[in-house]
């Protein structure tokens, strides 16, 4: 998980495999150890003087800690201006100071080892990146344990392979809003961590700021501020779900979340107002002053005014007039209690409507003049109104006998098709309605024509 890359300014890079298998560790101790050994060898060469043992005479009194002043040009780019030089710089400064000593002063190797601290010029840069492969937006305990194990191995290798045995390391870990963090080396032992800030970002644009003795690390980690992290995860899921539902709705595909989501009304509440709105619309259209072709007009209304399932039908129910008299019971009968909730309309329900629509309103069938072979005679209208007055209450007998069996047939044969596929229903209904309408028309025409 944690991918580690490290750079070294003064030493060559050496590959080292960690348990993660994909980490690089620089050999930070190579140049320091080589410089120290070379400085010791040159110091021994300088101690070989022709006048004998270097530990007699003025050299015993002149043993003192050798302090090397830091030149101005060497202090550039250093983090601490008062720090001591590395082994090579200390050797060059000692060579400059050596001849100035009283009576040809020689260097002591003990003073060089003890009083002049040989520091490595280990410019190290470590970058730890925690990837989010599953796009969950959260860092698990296993991810953090793997990352900290990798960091521990890298820091342990850097400390144990150093030339100085008493070298300690202070780790300062900060996760800043920018995708870059800093690790500093300092005196106290152990790990001193500042409070980290959580930054859950999708992109990882790494711009580590490189400095001397500073390890740059980028770790995505929730520790002290988990609230933005916990809010980020569900927000991503909701956003993706909304986008998916939006495109599915545009394509006309029925999906589970759009039908039963928190923002959608129940299916039964949507479909029952749909049927009632279409019937009420047919009722209002049939009450227009032009009383011809009521059956044909009703079938056209059922075709043209199909209310979509996603649109609430409350406005249609409020604006349409309430049905009165015998047709009120008829209009309520198609959506009877036998219909299962959530089952959308289909072609079988359209057939059921077409079967007993003409049976309920037989006197209105002769009003359609579009399919007559010849126009009806004038007395036909008077008998039509008398027949309508006589048979005004008779159609109620047929719906009481028929709707029970018809609705059971609808419940039994109704396939569970989505509401989006039910737009072919009114076409079949219109065709069969015309068929039965013509049958009734011819029957009534031959019945009334001799008179």
UniProtKB/Swiss-Prot annotation:
InterPro entries assigned: EF-hand-dom_pair, EF_hand_dom, Nkd-like
GO CC terms:
basolateral plasma membrane; cell periphery; cytoplasm; cytoplasmic vesicle; exocytic vesicle; lateral plasma membrane; plasma membrane
What GO molecular-function term can you cite, just one? Answer: ubiquitin protein ligase binding
Q: Where is this region: Interaction with DVL1, DVL2 and DVL3?
A: 113-178
Lipidated residues (N-myristoyl glycine): 2
For bias type Low complexity, the affected ranges are 332-351
Q: Where does Ca(2+) bind?
A: 132, 134, 138, 143
Q: Which residues form the EF-hand domain?
A: 119-154
Region listing for Targeting to the basolateral cell membrane, in residue ranges: 2-173
Main location, first listed in the record: membrane
Q: SUPFAM superfamilies from the xrefs?
A: EF-hand (SSF47473)
Where's it found, cell-wise? Cell membrane; Cytoplasm; Cytoplasmic vesicle
Which Gene Ontology BP terms does the record give? exocytosis; Golgi vesicle fusion to target membrane; negative regulation of canonical Wnt signaling pathway; negative regulation of Wnt signaling pathway; positive regulation of proteasomal ubiquitin-dependent protein catabolic process; positive regulation of protein localization to plasma membrane; positive regulation of protein processing; protein localization to plasma membrane
- Stretch list, region Disordered: 1-108, 162-237, 256-408
Q: How is it modified after translation?
A: Ubiquitinated, leading to rapid proteasomal degradation. Interaction with TGFA interferes with RNF25 binding and protects against ubiquitination mediated by RNF25.
Domain of life per record: Eukaryota
UniProt biased composition (Basic and acidic residues): 34-63, 89-99, 180-215
Q: Which UniProt keywords apply?
A: Calcium, Cell membrane, Cytoplasm, Cytoplasmic vesicle, Exocytosis, Lipoprotein, Membrane, Metal-binding, Myristate, Transport, Ubl conjugation, Wnt signaling pathway
Q: In which tissues is it expressed?
A: Expressed in kidney, lung, pancreas and spleen.
What is written about domains in the entry's comments?
The N-terminal domain comprising the first 217 amino acid residues is mostly unstructured.
Instruction: Say which family it is in.
Output: Belongs to the NKD family.
Subunit-level organization: Interacts with DVL1, DVL2, DVL3 and PPP2R3A. Interacts with RNF25 and TGFA (via cytoplasmic domain).
Job description of the protein = Cell autonomous antagonist of the canonical Wnt signaling pathway. May activate a second Wnt signaling pathway that controls planar cell polarity. Required for processing of TGFA and for targeting of TGFA to the basolateral membrane of polarized epithelial cells.
Report the protein name in the record. Protein naked cuticle homolog 2
Taxonomic classification, please? Eukaryota, Metazoa, Chordata, Craniata, Vertebrata
Q: Supply the gene name.
A: NKD2
């Amino acid at each position: 998980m944690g991918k580690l890359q490290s750079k070294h300014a003064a030493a060559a890079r050496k590959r080292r495999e960690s348990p993660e298998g994909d980490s690089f560790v620089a050999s930070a101790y190579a140049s320091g150890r080589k410089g120290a050994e070379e400085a010791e060898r040159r110091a021994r060469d300088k101690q070989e003087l022709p006048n004998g043992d270097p530990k007699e005479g003025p050299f015993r009194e002149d043993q003192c800690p050798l302090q090397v002043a830091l030149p101005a040009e060497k202090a550039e780019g250093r983090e601490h201006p008062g720090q001591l030089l590395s082994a090579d710089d200390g050797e060059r400064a000692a060579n400059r100071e050596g001849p100035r000593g009283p009576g040809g002063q020689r260097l002591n190797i003990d003073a060089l080892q003890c009083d002049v601290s040989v520091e490595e010029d280990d410019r190290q840069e470590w970058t730890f990146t925690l990837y989010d492969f599953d796009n969950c937006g959260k860092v698990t305990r296993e991810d953090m344990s793997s990352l900290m194990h990798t960091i521990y191995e890298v820091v342990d290798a850097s400390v144990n392979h150093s030339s100085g045995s008493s070298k300690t390391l202070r780790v300062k870990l900060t996760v800043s809003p920018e995708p870059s963090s800093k690790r500093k080396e300092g005196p106290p032992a152990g790990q001193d961590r500042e409070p980290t800030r959580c930054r859950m970002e999708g992109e990882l644009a790494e711009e580590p700021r490189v400095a001397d003795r500073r390890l740059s690390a980028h770790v995505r980690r929730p520790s002290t501020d988990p609230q933005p992290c916990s809010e980020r995860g569900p927000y991503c899921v909701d956003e993706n779900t909304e986008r998916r539902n939006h495109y599915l709705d545009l394509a006309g595909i029925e999906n589970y979340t759009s039908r039963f989501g928190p923002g959608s009304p129940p299916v039964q509440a949507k479909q029952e107002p749909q049927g009632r709105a279409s019937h009420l619309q047919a009722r209002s259209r049939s009450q227009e002053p032009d009383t011809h072709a009521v059956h044909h007009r009703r079938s056209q209304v059922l075709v043209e005014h199909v209310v979509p399932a996603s649109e609430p039908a409350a406005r249609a129910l409020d604006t349409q007039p309430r049905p009165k008299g015998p047709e009120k019971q008829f209009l309520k009968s198609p959506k009877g209690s036998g219909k299962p909730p959530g089952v959308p309309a289909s072609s079988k329900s359209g057939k059921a409507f077409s079967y007993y629509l003409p049976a309920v309103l037989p006197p209105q069938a002769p009003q359609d003049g579009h399919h007559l072979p010849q126009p009806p005679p004038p007395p036909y209208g008077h008998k039509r109104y008398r027949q309508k007055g006589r048979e005004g209450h008779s159609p109620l007998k047929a719906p009481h006998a028929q709707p029970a069996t018809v609705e059971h047939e609808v419940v039994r044969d109704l396939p569970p098709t989505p509401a989006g596929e039910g737009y072919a229903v009114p076409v079949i209904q219109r065709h069969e309605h015309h068929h039965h309408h013509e049958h009734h028309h011819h029957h009534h025409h031959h019945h009334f024509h001799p008179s």
